Amino acid sequence: MTIMRKTHPLMKLVNHAFIDLPAPSNISGWWNFGSLLGMCLIIQITSGLFLAMHYTPDTLTAFSSVTHICRDVNYGWLIRYIHANGASLFFICLYLHIGRGIYYGSYSYMETWNIGIILLFLTMATAFMGYVLPWGQMSFWGATVITNLLSAIPYIGTDLVEWIWGGFSVDKATLNRFFAFHFILPFIIAAMAMVHLLFLHETGSNNPLGIPSDCDKIPFHPYYTTKDFLGIVLLLTFFLILVLFFPDLLGDPDNYSPANPLNTPPHIKPEWYFLFAYAILRSIPNKLGGVIALILSILILALLPHIQTASQRSLMFRPISQFLFWLLVSDVLILTWIGGQPVEPPFIIIGQIASLSYFTIILALMPIAGIIENKMLKW
């Protein structure tokens, strides 16, 4: 008798994606982040759904409704902190996943990589809109500052900003539409993640050596299901410690004050996971130039397959490129730190040097290193 998972139309899909999928025998723990991101998305959609049952997207009651969730709803405080810190967990996994892709040359699978970049943009948009919903001080001013950046677009900028706001300032209409978009986008992300997987399974997974692994494949289940489960248990342990012991560690104290359009916080900044891009934005004195640099800081990932010069795919045996990769990681961490600092010396110049280094490493130094390594290996 044929096994049902191999014949049933629906189970056949699951079987080909998660059970009988041929996977390279040597992929390391760095390949766990795909499943961890899936888990984060499920956590966020579930906790968000329960929060939406009690939240009211109205400027007069939004802040109070979040307070009500924390004080009066059974385990509301837990759901709220799971959702708030779940976003941080999502971005930690996302950045590690992208770092893995750069290190091991996974960007060679261009369709998968480009869908991944779209997923990153969608996730950033969702997180930004979610940050506005509690209607605290940083929610309001963050929304005002970031949406106002669109006014730098020539000719249509001002009209575009007023169209997004639904008026002449961030107000009830803005909050309402941000709630609607914040609710629908995670489902679009889930659909795009399916497309991401579809393209990945067309080519098969990359591996640490960066060489074809068709001659040595093993079934995904039980080997990698077990491995993924271990990763999920470890990550959930870390996550629950964060939620239950340090729930406000990654948040901003200003967001515990209700939004007040008449009182500007001394230092407006986004959540920690956007600080690197915010630092790049601030490092350019011109408004339009800053917006372009901000977009390019993410869009530059799409150039990686086109500026790859090395004959080897992975950085595993390329010491110069390895050094540059870790220099890039350090640079992003410095940018994250600078983004959280006030705009004053010496932070301004540090931010400008770090921003210039970010683009120089990716656009110039890494391709040059690839050529040098080819010469060293006589390829």
Swiss-Prot record:
Reported cofactor(s):
heme b
Positions binding heme b b566 in this chain are H97, H196
Q: Which residues bind a ubiquinone?
A: H201
Q: Name a single GO biological process.
A: mitochondrial electron transport, ubiquinol to cytochrome c
Regions crossing the membrane: 33-53, 77-98, 113-133, 178-198, 226-246, 288-308, 320-340, 347-367
Q: Does the keyword Transport apply?
A: yes
Enumerate the residues binding heme b b562.
H83, H182
* Superkingdom in the source lineage: Eukaryota
Q: Which SUPFAM superfamilies match?
A: a domain/subunit of cytochrome bc1 complex (Ubiquinol-cytochrome c reductase) (SSF81648), Transmembrane di-heme cytochromes (SSF81342)
Q: Where in the cell is it found?
A: Mitochondrion inner membrane
One GO location term (cellular component)? respiratory chain complex III
For this protein, the record's PANTHER family field holds: CYTOCHROME B
> What is the name attached to this protein's record?
Cytochrome b
The record lists the organism as: Dipodomys spectabilis
